[in-house]
Amino acid sequence: MEEQVLPELDVAELELQAVIGFNGHVPNGLKCHPDQEHLIYPLGCTVLIQAINTNEQNFLHGHGNNVSCVTISKEGDYIASGQVTFMGFKADIILWDFKKRELIARLSLHKGKIEALAFSPNDLYLVSLGGPDDGSVVVWSIAKRDAICGSPAAGLNVGNATSVVFSRCRDEMFVTAGNGTIRVWELDLPNRKIWPTECQTGQMKRIVLSTGMADDDSFFYLGTTTGDILKMNPKTKLLADTGPVKDKFSLGVSALRCLKMGGLLVGSGAGLLIFCKSPSYKPIKKVQLQGGITSITLRGEGHQFFVGTEESHIYRVNFTDFKETLIATCHFEAVQDIVFPFGTAELFATCAKKDIRVWHTMSKRELLRITVPNMTCHGIDFMRDGKSIISAWDDGKIRAFAPESGRLMYTINSAHRIGVTAIATTSDCKRIISGGGEGEVRVWQVGCQTQKLEEALKEHKSSVSCIRVKKNNEECVTASTDGTCIIWDLVRLRRNQMILANTLFQCVCYHPEEFQIITSGTDRKIAYWEVFDGSVIRELEGSLSGSINGMDITQEGGHFVTGGHDHLVKVWDYNEGEVTHVGVGHSGNIMAMRISPGNQYIVSVSADGAILRWKYPFAS
C-alpha cells in the first residue's frame, strides 16, 4: 500500500458523489452518533458519516493507510480514528470535529497499528491501545491535544491487549483486555501515571474479543473466543459469574453491548445476534444474520440498534420484535469488474468473490445479488439486448444469468483450463469472446438453446486481461499479461496484428473512430497504437507509483479515464495527452472503471470492496 500522492495543484479535482462500501472487518467499526441521525464507519483510509434518513454522505480524509478503529465521544462532538501502518512506522490517531467535519489534531506515539480507542465519559481524555508491535496504552488530554502518560498494556508473561472500555461514570478508570490479560486502570493525574490492577479469573484462561461496561459501572462484561461471557466487578477486580455453561456461542463472542434496562446484546462470529441476561446467558431473543458480527451500536437507549458484519452488511434491528432489516451492503472482497448495460446509466453491475451484484446508480441500492459459493467472478458483460449477464469465473466456466431474476440461464463448462479471466460480447448478441488464464482466446456461438465453440485462438502465452470488440463485430482486441496485444479478425478467425511492449498489459480501449487503440499496464505508461500496422503513436506517463488496472474512453473519444495502484482516478484529454481532473478517494488499488453511457458519471471499483461514483467533469 503506497501512501497517497496528492496531485499537483493545477489539476482540477473530480467531484465524488457517492460511495458504496463498508469495512466490516474493523472491530466495533460501525457507530451510531448520539444525535441518532448519523452512522459513522470506516472504509479503507476514509471515515464515512452517513445520514440515516437521507443517506447523505460526508467523508473524513486524512489517514495515509487503512483505518483500524473508530470511536465517538459521549456527547458526539468528537470522533477519533486510528490506522495501521508499516512495521516500525508511527501510526496516527486523528481527532475530528463532528459538526465541522474537519481534522482537529493528529496524535502520534504508537507504532504499527492502533488496536482500540475510547473516550472518557466527560470527554476529558482519550485512551488508545497500540497493536502487537507496540503493546502500550496511552492516555491523551483532549483539551491539550497531547499525551498525559503511557504504560505497557499487558504484563510480560501474557498476550496482547486488544480491546479497551472506559468507565461510564468516572473519567479516571478504564479497562483493557486481550489474550490472557484483564486489567483495570486508574489514572493518577497529578503524578501523570496510570496504575494497573490485574483481574483474577482463577483457573480460567480466556482470550477476550469484546468488552462492555454497565451503565452504573457496577460490572463489566467480556466476550471471549471460547464463546462464553465473563462478568467482572471493577471494584473488587473479581469474577462475578460466567456463562453460558452449555451451548456456547459459536466462533466466539465478537461483539457485546450492555443495555440500560439490563441484559446484554451479544453478537457471535457465526452471525447469531442474541439478547440474554446474567447469570444464565441463555438466549431470550435471537436472530441469524449473514457474516460474523463485528459491531453492535445502539440508537438512543437501545430501542433500535445497528449491527455490522464481516460480510459488509449493515442491519437495523428493532428491539421489540427483534427482526432485522438490511439497510446497506457492499462487496467484502476486491471488486473485479464493473459494467453498464447498453445505453443506460440508471444501473450497473459489479462482480467479486462469490457474487455478482446489480446496483441502482442514484440511490446506491442493491437491486440483485447472484451468488456462486466459493468462486470468484473475474469479468462481466451485459448482452446488448439486455436479456442476460455473461460472467467469467475462476472455475473455468462461463455463466449467463437473467438480469431481473438472477436465474441461471446457461453454463458453458470447461470454457478455459485455468479459469476464465476476461469476457466480451458482440452487439448482435450471437457471440461471446472469452479469454483464459492459459492465454487462449475462444469465440463462442450462442443461440437460444445451444452454445458452441467456434474457434480457439492460441497466440497469447499468458492470461488474457482485457477484451474489447469493434462496433461492427468484425474485429476485436485482446490484452495479455505476456506483453502482447493482439487484434483478431472475427470473420476469418485469425490474427490481424500484434503489438509488443515490455509490460504486463492490464487494459485496452478502442478509440471510437476505431483506427487507434490505447493500452496500459504495469509499466505505468499509456500507449496509443495504430490498429492498421500495430505501430506506436505515442506514450504518456500514466502514473508515478504503480500499475494502471482500469481504463475507459468516452463515446465521442475526446477524453478517457484511468485508475490503478496509485488509488487516483485520472481524466485525460485524448488529443493533448494531459490530465485534466484527478479524483482522490480510493484507499485500495483501483481494479476497474467505466464512464456511464451519456457521460454523466465515472464509476470506479477497488480492491477494498469499495464502489465510488464521480461526477463526469465535462458537459456532454
UniProtKB/Swiss-Prot annotation:
<feature type="repeat" description="WD 2">
    <location>
        <begin position="109"/>
        <end position="150"/>
    </location>
</feature>
<dbReference type="GO" id="GO:0007283">
    <property type="term" value="P:spermatogenesis"/>
</dbReference>
<feature type="repeat" description="WD 7">
    <location>
        <begin position="415"/>
        <end position="454"/>
    </location>
</feature>
<dbReference type="GO" id="GO:0160112">
    <property type="term" value="C:axonemal B tubule inner sheath"/>
</dbReference>
<keyword id="KW-0677">Repeat</keyword>
<keyword id="KW-0966">Cell projection</keyword>
<feature type="repeat" description="WD 4">
    <location>
        <begin position="288"/>
        <end position="327"/>
    </location>
</feature>
<dbReference type="GO" id="GO:0007338">
    <property type="term" value="P:single fertilization"/>
</dbReference>
<dbReference type="GO" id="GO:0061966">
    <property type="term" value="P:establishment of left/right asymmetry"/>
</dbReference>
<comment type="similarity">
    <text>Belongs to the CFAP52 family.</text>
</comment>
<feature type="repeat" description="WD 1">
    <location>
        <begin position="62"/>
        <end position="106"/>
    </location>
</feature>
<feature type="repeat" description="WD 5">
    <location>
        <begin position="330"/>
        <end position="369"/>
    </location>
</feature>
<dbReference type="GO" id="GO:0097225">
    <property type="term" value="C:sperm midpiece"/>
</dbReference>
<keyword id="KW-0963">Cytoplasm</keyword>
<keyword id="KW-0853">WD repeat</keyword>
<dbReference type="GO" id="GO:0051012">
    <property type="term" value="P:microtubule sliding"/>
</dbReference>
<feature type="repeat" description="WD 9">
    <location>
        <begin position="500"/>
        <end position="541"/>
    </location>
</feature>
<dbReference type="Pfam" id="PF00400">
    <property type="entry name" value="WD40"/>
</dbReference>
<dbReference type="GO" id="GO:0005879">
    <property type="term" value="C:axonemal microtubule"/>
</dbReference>
<comment type="subunit">
    <text>Microtubule inner protein component of sperm flagellar doublet microtubules. Interacts with BRCA2. Interacts with the CCT chaperonin complex. Interacts with HSP70. Interacts with AK8. Interacts with CFAP45. Interacts with DNAI1. Interacts with IQDC.</text>
</comment>
<dbReference type="GO" id="GO:0036126">
    <property type="term" value="C:sperm flagellum"/>
</dbReference>
<dbReference type="GO" id="GO:0007286">
    <property type="term" value="P:spermatid development"/>
</dbReference>
<comment type="function">
    <text>Microtubule inner protein (MIP) part of the dynein-decorated doublet microtubules (DMTs) in cilia axoneme. Important for proper ciliary and flagellar beating. May act in cooperation with CFAP45 and axonemal dynein subunit DNAH11. May play a role in cell growth and/or survival.</text>
</comment>
<dbReference type="InterPro" id="IPR036322">
    <property type="entry name" value="WD40_repeat_dom_sf"/>
</dbReference>
<feature type="repeat" description="WD 6">
    <location>
        <begin position="372"/>
        <end position="411"/>
    </location>
</feature>
<dbReference type="InterPro" id="IPR019775">
    <property type="entry name" value="WD40_repeat_CS"/>
</dbReference>
<dbReference type="GO" id="GO:0030317">
    <property type="term" value="P:flagellated sperm motility"/>
</dbReference>
<dbReference type="InterPro" id="IPR015943">
    <property type="entry name" value="WD40/YVTN_repeat-like_dom_sf"/>
</dbReference>
<dbReference type="GO" id="GO:0010467">
    <property type="term" value="P:gene expression"/>
</dbReference>
<keyword id="KW-0206">Cytoskeleton</keyword>
<feature type="repeat" description="WD 3">
    <location>
        <begin position="156"/>
        <end position="195"/>
    </location>
</feature>
<dbReference type="InterPro" id="IPR050630">
    <property type="entry name" value="WD_repeat_EMAP"/>
</dbReference>
<protein>
    <recommendedName>
        <fullName>Cilia- and flagella-associated protein 52</fullName>
    </recommendedName>
</protein>
<feature type="repeat" description="WD 11">
    <location>
        <begin position="585"/>
        <end position="620"/>
    </location>
</feature>
<keyword id="KW-0282">Flagellum</keyword>
<keyword id="KW-0969">Cilium</keyword>
<dbReference type="InterPro" id="IPR001680">
    <property type="entry name" value="WD40_rpt"/>
</dbReference>
<feature type="repeat" description="WD 8">
    <location>
        <begin position="459"/>
        <end position="498"/>
    </location>
</feature>
<feature type="repeat" description="WD 10">
    <location>
        <begin position="543"/>
        <end position="582"/>
    </location>
</feature>
